[in-house]
């Protein structure tokens, strides 16, 4: 196609990660005749933050992440954030259930597997906190099956690798949620994109969006270059979604929308220790989250995770922070400096002057040797040997910097930016990220297609039966939806070797072990 020719399309999706993949499938289910064009700078889908090696794959549902349940005055536990994140995850889970039932996702076991989610603490004060957390969460229907465990024998039965060589004179405790999942968002993204592509979506891999220009009729001119040949082309789109991970902010800045002004981004790299040693993976089958180091940011919460990637079990421990000015793992060192604009300079400088804790944390992380990292792992698994573990570089996270007063504030979460006229939207931020892709994209659709969204609601409620309802307020509906999803997603049988769990093992005898 020559530069003079302009291809028209109803929707342009920038980036082939979980956000664009989810939006493409939702649009195709609701408006099968709309034309969609997906543009991805790399040669394959989900190769950046959605790739399983580049994210934690936790299926963030706030079952185990302690930063979602902060302790308040007098030892009270605030569960507001945990309930909100879990409600969002339930929406995603319902969409995946519908997608499996209706042929959108053909290979369920390739993207989701059952794995317990566990909170772990040591030390008397932290044990008190975890008991209080359990007491606060378990009355809520979304967390009703959580267990509290402080018995050393039960700890060792559930988590034998973590029990090896542990000095149990220091008290330990667990919040154990049997109903957790491990999610390969790379596989999930590729299946969703495959479904939409088979139904007419144009995919441009190895192509990069260089500019976005608003047209007089309200549409967008999208300038694209083929990264292999240098050939240029233009697309005209009625709606543009920028789901380009760390690359979203620069593109929204180029679009010049008012809503992006004042926003900045701060890139933080991630690193993991990983092992595929079958002896170790057989003896640790859970995602176990600990307490963040004192003064460290929420993204630093350490966890020892079972991962299932391409059918093989792995253990990952981290994250350890790295630093690069790149906004993408395969980005450019100029990403950060080029993102500083007159309209966000105050925000960026404000964060630089106030986030000393983050700066101190990053410097400390950068000074760690590989031996230091394994020593950190030994807080979880005292018997860990250096020779079993290798360092793996994960993806880049770009934390949102938002204008506040005359300065700025660093936010740990995801933010949807949408133009007032609904012609363009984008997603900024990181955790909880991928697990909340469905509610995030429903938010985009409601804000950008307000007139059509009302007409879509009957179909959307078929896809997400609880849409508009808080399941934590409707225990009967939650049980029905949960049981159906568990069956369809094949999550009703624990993986081989996982223990049977009851409702509270605090004073129970050890149960038997499932081997099937």
From Swiss-Prot:
GO terms for molecular function: 2-hydroxyglutarate dehydrogenase activity; L-malate dehydrogenase (quinone) activity. Keywords: FAD, Flavoprotein, Oxidoreductase, Tricarboxylic acid cycle. Gene3D superfamilies: FAD/NAD(P)-binding domain. Its EC number is 1.1.5.4. GO terms for biological process: tricarboxylic acid cycle. It catalyses: (S)-malate + a quinone = a quinol + oxaloacetate. Coiled coil: none annotated. It holds the Pfam family Mqo. Its cofactor is FAD. Pathway: Carbohydrate metabolism; tricarboxylic acid cycle; oxaloacetate from (S)-malate (quinone route): step 1/1. PANTHER family: L-2-HYDROXYGLUTARATE DEHYDROGENASE, MITOCHONDRIAL (PTHR43104:SF2). Belongs to the MQO family. This is Probable malate:quinone oxidoreductase.
């Amino acid at each position: 196609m020559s530069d003079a020719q302009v291809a028209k399309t109803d929707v342009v999706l920038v980036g082939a990660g979980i956000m664009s993949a989810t939006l493409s499938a939702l649009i195709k289910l609701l408006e099968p005749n709309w034309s969609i064009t997906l543009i991805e700078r790399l040669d394959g889908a989900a190769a950046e933050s959605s790739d399983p090696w580049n994210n934690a794959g936790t299926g963030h549902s706030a079952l185990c992440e302690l930063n979602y349940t902060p302790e308040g005055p007098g030892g009270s536990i605030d569960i507001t954030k945990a309930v909100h994140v879990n409600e969002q995850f339930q929406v995603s889970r319902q969409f995946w259930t519908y997608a499996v039932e209706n042929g959108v996702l053909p290979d369920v076991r390739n993207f989701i597997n059952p794995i317990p989610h566990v909170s772990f603490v040591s030390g008397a004060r932290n044990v008190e906190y975890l008991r209080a957390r359990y007491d606060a969460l378990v009355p809520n229907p979304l967390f009703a099956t959580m267990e509290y465990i402080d018995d050393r024998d039960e700890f060792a039965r559930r988590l034998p690798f973590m029990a090896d060589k542990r000095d149990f004179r220091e008290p330990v405790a667990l919040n154990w949620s049997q109903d957790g999942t491990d999610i390969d968002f790379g596989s999930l993204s590729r299946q969703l994109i495959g479904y939409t592509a088979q139904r007419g979506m144009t995919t441009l891999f190895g192509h990069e969006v260089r500019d976005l220009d608003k047209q007089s009729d309200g549409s967008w001119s999208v300038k694209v270059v083929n990264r292999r040949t240098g050939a240029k082309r233009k697309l005209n789109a009625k709606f543009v979604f920028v789901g380009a991970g760390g690359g979203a902010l620069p593109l929204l800045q180029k679009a010049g929308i008012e809503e992006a002004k004042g926003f900045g981004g701060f890139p933080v790299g991630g690193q993991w220790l990983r092992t595929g040693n079958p002896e170790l993976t057989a003896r640790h089958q859970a995602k176990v989250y600990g307490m963040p180091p004192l003064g460290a940011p929420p993204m630093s919460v350490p966890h020892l995770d079972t991962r299932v990637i391409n059918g093989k079990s792995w253990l990952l421990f981290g994250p350890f922070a790295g630093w690069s000015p790149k906004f993408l793992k395969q980005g450019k060192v100029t990403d950060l400096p080029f993102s500083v604009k007159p309209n966000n300079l105050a925000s960026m400088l404000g964060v630089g002057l106030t986030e000393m804790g983050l700066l101190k944390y990053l410097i400390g992380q950068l000074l760690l040797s590989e031996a230091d990292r394994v020593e950190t792992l030994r807080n979880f698994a005292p018997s860990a040997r250096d020779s079993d573990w290798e360092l793996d570089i994960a993806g880049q996270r770009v934390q949102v910097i938002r204008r506040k007063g005359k300065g700025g504030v660093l936010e740990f979460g995801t933010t949807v930016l949408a133009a007032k006229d609904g012609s363009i939207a984008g997603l900024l931020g990181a955790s909880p990220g991928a697990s909340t892709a469905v509610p995030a994209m429903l938010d985009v659709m409601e804000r950008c297609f307000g007139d059509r969204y009302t007409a879509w609601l009957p179909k959307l409620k078929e896809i997400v039966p609880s849409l508009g309802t808080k399941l934590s307020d409707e225990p009967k509906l939650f049980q029905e939806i949960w049981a159906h999803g568990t069956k369809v997603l094949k999550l009703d049988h624990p993986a081989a070797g996982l223990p049977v769990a009851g409702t509270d093992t605090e004073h129970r005898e050890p149960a038997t072990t499932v081997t099937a």
